[in-house]
Design a protein with these regions (language model features):
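Short amphipathic alpha-helical interaction segments
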Residues: 161-166
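Short alpha-helical segments that sit at the start of domains
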Residues: 111-141
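Generic amphipathic alpha-helical segments used as scaffolds and interaction surfaces in large
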Residues: 83, 87, 122-126, 158
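Short acidic, hydrophobic short linear motifs in intrinsically disordered regions
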Residues: 145-160
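Phosphate/pyrophosphate-binding active-site loops
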Residues: 1-111
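Alpha-helix termini
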Residues: 11-13, 143-146
Length: 166
C-alpha cells in the first residue's frame, strides 16, 4: 500500500507532484526493490514508469523502454544493484533519464523506418520479382539494426533458396 499511496500522491497536478522523469525513475526503482511478486516485477516496473510518464504528458508515451533495457541488460541490472541499497539514487535517476531518452530516440527512428518502408513499398513494391520481394521483406524484418555484417551472398542465397549460379 505504501507504494500505491506514494504513486497516487505524486501524480501530476497533485500537491506532491514530482517531475515526470524523477517520478518514473523512482517508481521503477521502488517497485523493483520491494519485489512483491515471484515473477514479472521488472515488466510491471517498466509499465509503471511508462504510466508515470504518460500521466505527465496526458497521453501514451512513445518510448521503447523494454527494448532498450533488454539490449543493455547488464548495465540495467548493474544500475539497479548500485542503487537499491540506500536512499541516494541520483545515479539511478541519471541512468534512467538517459535510458528514457534512448528509448524515445529508438521509437522515433523506428517510426521513421516504418514510414520509409511503407513509402518504398507504395512506390516500387509491385515491381519486385518473387526473390527480390523475399529479400526486401527479410531485410525489413531485421529492423533498424539490419543484418549483422550486411547482406552477404550467403544470406541472399539462404533467403531466396537459390544457387550461386542464379
Amino acid at each position: 500500500n505504501a507504494f500505491l499511496n506514494w504513486f497516487a500522491k505524486t501524480t501530476p497536478g497533485s500537491e506532491g507532484e514530482l517531475p515526470a522523469l524523477t517520478r518514473a525513475g523512482i517508481a521503477h526503482l521502488y517497485f523493483v526493490c520491494i519485489h512483491p511478486f515471484e515473477d514479472g516485477n521488472g515488466r510491471i516496473a517498466r509499465a509503471l514508469s511508462e504510466k508515470a510518464l504518460s500521466q505527465s504528458i496526458g497521453q501514451p508515451t512513445l518510448a521503447a523502454l523494454s527494448r532498450i533495457l533488454h539490449g543493455k541488460r547488464k548495465a540495467y541490472y548493474d544500475a539497479l544493484e548500485l542503487n537499491n541499497k540506500n536512499n541516494e539514487i541520483t545515479d539511478w535517476l541519471v541512468y534512467f533519464a538517459k535510458t528514457i531518452l534512448k528509448a524515445q530516440s529508438y521509437s522515433l527512428n523506428m517510426i521513421d523506418f516504418l514510414i520509409e518502408k511503407t513509402k518504398l513499398y507504395d512506390r516500387i513494391g509491385s515491381q519486385f520479382n518473387k526473390r527480390q520481394g523475399k529479400v526486401i521483406e527479410r531485410m525489413f524484418r531485421e529492423g533498424l539494426e539490419g543484418f549483422k555484417g550486411g547482406l552477404s551472398t550467403e544470406n541472399y542465397l539462404s533467403i531466396t533458396g537459390t544457387s550461386r549460379a542464379t
